[in-house]
Amino acid sequence: MSSPQVKVFTFSSLLIFLTPILALIYAVLSRNFTFLNYVHVITGGTWTGIDLFMGLIMSRILRSLEPQLRAQFIMRLTPLMLLFMPSLASVAITAGVYIATWLHIFDLSNPLIIASGIIVIILSVQGFGIIMPNEVRIFLEIRRGAKNKEKINKLGMRNIYVSGSQVIFQIAIIFIMSLLTVG
């Protein structure tokens, strides 16, 4: 079975990558708080939803597939996620900081802000320190002809499990955000 030709920088993938970033830039530059809040909620909710889906649903489906099919799925998923998820995560976090600043609740002596910061650090380390490097490794393996399917499966499944574990922290930060908005 030949490996698929992987194109990361297609028009649609760049559009998917840039849309959240451009929305954030517009919201900040226009000082449109409602739109900024929308950008934060939609990117954060999408990030959480994707991680929930990956961790709870896709992990079970992928475990049940033959290794060859699992590798094929991961090889198709990775190039899309390589651009999309960092864009979503970065925009959700940045929009959240802007919102907290605009609401004058970004106070580093506030235990809820400290807890949010700790969770954001954990999520960032997982996303940018574990998941993204694994996606780059998978992508490079695909570009080399995808001969090492075992490596692709191992790294891909690790990412699926880490995505699933992120949901715990995302639910915690959603709870903290609800406390912050209520007062």
Please identify what each model-predicted range represents.
Residues 1-183:
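Polytopic transmembrane helical bundles with strong interfacial aromatic enrichment
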